[in-house]
């Protein structure tokens, strides 16, 4: 896993203990799942708009926001990037049709 993702996951875990008044991430945790999901949705929409616009720098910027808030959601549910990477590894080598069929 990327060192950056690992370090970010560690910081996100630490933020669970911080005061919501002193940390943006801690404030998201304090507000709960619905607020975190709203942020993930907002960032997903902004990523879509950036993708449509075709500005590579903006696509990267918005994708970073999306990844960050997705990682907040993972941490809020006691998950981390390793869990997602494990699932991607499971899917690697499967055709899209095989993977979809395995969910039934």
Q: Where are each of the predicted segments found?
A:
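Flexible "arm" and connector segments at domain edges
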Residues: 1-63, 67-104
């Amino acid at each position: 896993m990327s060192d950056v993702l690992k370090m970010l996951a560690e910081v996100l875990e630490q933020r669970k203990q911080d005061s919501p008044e002193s940390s943006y991430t801690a404030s998201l945790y304090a507000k709960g799942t619905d607020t975190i999901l709203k942020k993930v949705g907002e960032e997903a929409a902004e990523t879509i708009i950036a993708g449509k616009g075709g500005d590579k720098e903006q696509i990267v910027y918005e994708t970073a926001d999306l990844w960050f808030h997705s990682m907040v959601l993972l941490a809020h549910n006691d998950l981390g990037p390793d869990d997602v990477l494990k699932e991607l590894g499971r899917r690697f080598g499967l055709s899209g049709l095989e993977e979809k069929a395995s969910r039934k």
